Curated annotation (Swiss-Prot):
Belongs to the HIBADH-related family. NP60 subfamily. Residues 167-179 bind DNA. This is Cytokine-like nuclear factor N-PAC. Pfam families: NAD_binding_11, NAD_binding_2, PWWP. The modification Phosphoserine is found at S130, S166, S539. One of its GO terms (cellular component) is nucleosome. Residues 215-224 are annotated as: Interaction with KDM1B. The lineage of its organism: Eukaryota, Metazoa, Chordata, Craniata, Vertebrata. Residues 91-145, 161-181 have a biased composition (Basic and acidic residues).
Length: 552
């Protein structure tokens, strides 16, 4: 493989983690955006998206040399738009060169025409020219020596300066030169069959593929497969305590929604997503005196909170750019990714120092990926999924599971006290997502067992109410048990926790078990029951509607 030197202004293909190569240009980074430590990388601005990121040199390839093979790999609409943007850029640059070339040619033609008109034609003039030619040559020779000597001195100084600024020298390359070289492969290996096939880049001998630095964002993630992301490059930036796995928590003595002793942070708070959980959270933040800017995909949901004193954000990017800490609570991994990486998304508003807290219940791969792209822009990231339901959200009695930037966790103290009774810090990003899925796996399986017990009581001629009374007097007694049984007995399945979401969490928990080769047969069985309930059009009802899967 040949080593190819890259420099400022070069057009390149940037490879970011699992995503397809994307065309971009090496540019100077903003003054307030520092280069990541320990990484040999360039700052690249991507065509078609106007996004940018620090990218390792191993993940960069020259644009022209690899254009054909990259186009064969990716046929997506956005990708083609990006390539078109590059070609338009090249056409404009070429047009400027041609204009400059034409101007020079015109000047040359005018000079030649002038010389032609003044050229001597008679024999006498030719002889005079010949006689004077010797003197002219002599004088020119002397002048040439003087000019050449001065030019040589200046040229030598310029060359010396250029050599000092550039690592390209003859002989053995200096250490710095290695930072500006990338391995160039003549073939593309390991292409996948799909239109969004991942491009396999050759790693350096000293750096395995697993340490790739995936910053890529602003892409149609729904077209790609499950990510295989590594968090090692980011954990150094996140201020977390590796040894803490849940020993730290912020607790309120009682329902913090009615606890007037909370001192709200003076930071500006943003909140994205006003669903069942988000609505209660925002309401409590406002009650406790926080300054909140809200955004929701359906803007009508914002009206009530505007009346309560919240401000309206037109886009997620606007909310993030105008707030110090932005929380988000959406339904699933796809929604979480779209919110961050989509048009006018969170990433567009992230600047150094901006904070993002994702409260969605998603898988560890998704939250790790989001953390990477946020941190790559200089932002701070915390995951903080919540355990509870709509009623607990309204009452400010949620349990918050947090992981990531420890400093940001502490900065969110007053917010967490307003929205929940307890919050736990679980260490590095991904831990909270895993814990949340396990909690919901237990809850979802328990709910399916409750429904199974009630239906079994019915078909065997036993009183369902008596069964509930017995359970409420035993060790299984809980608010959750009583409420869900009451829902079933009354036939009231108004959503407190959507059935489709608990099924989603069960599916993700099963996948988590598969990833570590751990059996989850109970969760798998419960998942099948919820899937049957969804087939019976119960997705938008409460999770207790799983009962109907047993009676149909």
């Amino acid at each position: 493989m040949a080593a190819v030197s890259l420099r400022l202004g070069d057009l390149v293909w940037g490879k970011l983690g699992r995503y397809p190569p994307w065309p971009g240009k090496i540019v100077n980074p903003p003054k307030d955006l520092k280069k990541p430590r320990g990484k040999k990388c360039f700052f690249v601005k991507f065509f078609g998206t106007e996004d940018h990121a620090w990218i390792k040199v191993e993940q960069l390839k020259p644009y022209h040399a690899h254009k054909e093979e990259m186009i064969k790999i990716n046929k997506g609409k956005r990708f083609q738009q990006a390539v078109d943007a590059v070609e338009e850029f090249l056409r404009r640059a070429k047009g400027k060169d041609q204009t400059s070339s034409h101007t020079s040619a015109d000047d040359k033609n005018r000079r030649n025409s002038s010389e032609e008109r003044s050229r001597p034609n008679s024999g006498d003039e030719k002889r005079k020219l010949s006689l004077s030619e010797g003197k002219v040559k002599k004088n020119m020779g002397e002048g040439k020596k003087r000019v050449t000597s001065g030019s040589a001195d200046r040229g030598s100084k310029c060359l010396k300066r250029a050599q000092e600024q550039s690592p390209r020298k003859r002989g053995r390359p200096p250490k710095d030169e290695k930072d500006l070289t990338i391995p160039e492969s003549s073939t593309v290996k390991g292409m996948m069959a799909g239109p969004m096939a991942a491009f396999k880049w050759q790693p350096t001998a000293s750096e395995p593929v697993k340490d790739a630095d995936p910053h890529f964002h602003h892409f149609l993630l729904s077209q790609t497969e499950k990510p295989a992301v590594c968090y090692q490059a980011i954990t150094k930036k996140l201020k977390i305590c590796e040894e803490e796995t849940g020993s730290t928590s912020i607790q309120a003595a009682d329902s913090t929604a009615v606890n007037g002793s909370i001192t709200p942070t003076d930071k500006k708070i943003g909140f994205l997503g006003l669903g069942l959980m988000g609505s209660g959270i925002v309401s409590n933040l406002l009650k406790m005196g926080h300054t909140v800017t809200v955004w929701n995909r359906t803007a009508e949901k914002c009206d009530l909170f505007i009346q309560e004193g919240a401000r309206l954000g037109r886009t997620p990017a606007e909310v993030v750019s105008t707030c110090d800490i932005t929380f988000a609570c959406v339904s699933d991994p796809k929604a979480a990714k779209d919110l961050v990486l989509g048009p006018s998304g969170v990433l567009q508003g992230i600047r150094p120092g901006k904070c993002y807290v994702d409260m969605s219940t998603v898988d560890a791969d998704t939250v790790t990926e989001l953390a990477q792209v946020i941190v790559s822009r200089g932002g701070r990231f915390l995951e903080a999924p919540v355990s509870g339901n709509q009623q607990l959200s309204n009452d400010g009695m949620l349990v918050i599971l947090a992981a990531g930037d420890r400093g940001l966790y502490e900065d969110c103290s007053s917010c967490f006290q307003a929205m929940g009774k307890t919050s736990f810090f679980l260490g590095e990003v991904g831990n909270a997502a895993k814990m949340m899925l396990i909690v919901n796996m237990v809850q979802g399986s328990f709910m399916a067992t409750i429904a199974e017990g009630l239906t079994l009581a019915q078909v065997t001629g036993q009183s369902q109410q008596t069964l509930l009374d017995i359970l409420n007097q035993g060790q299984l007694a809980s608010i959750f048990l009583d409420q869900k049984c009451q829902n079933i007995l009354q036939g009231n399945f108004k959503p407190d926790f959507y059935l489709k979401y608990i099924q989603k969490d069960l599916r993700l928990a099963i996948a988590l078990g598969d990833a570590v080769n751990h059996p989850t047969p109970m969760a798998a069985a419960a998942n099948e029951v919820y899937k049957r309930a969804k087939a019976l059009d119960q997705s938008d009802n409460d999770m207790s509607a799983v009962y109907r899967a047993y009676i149909h």
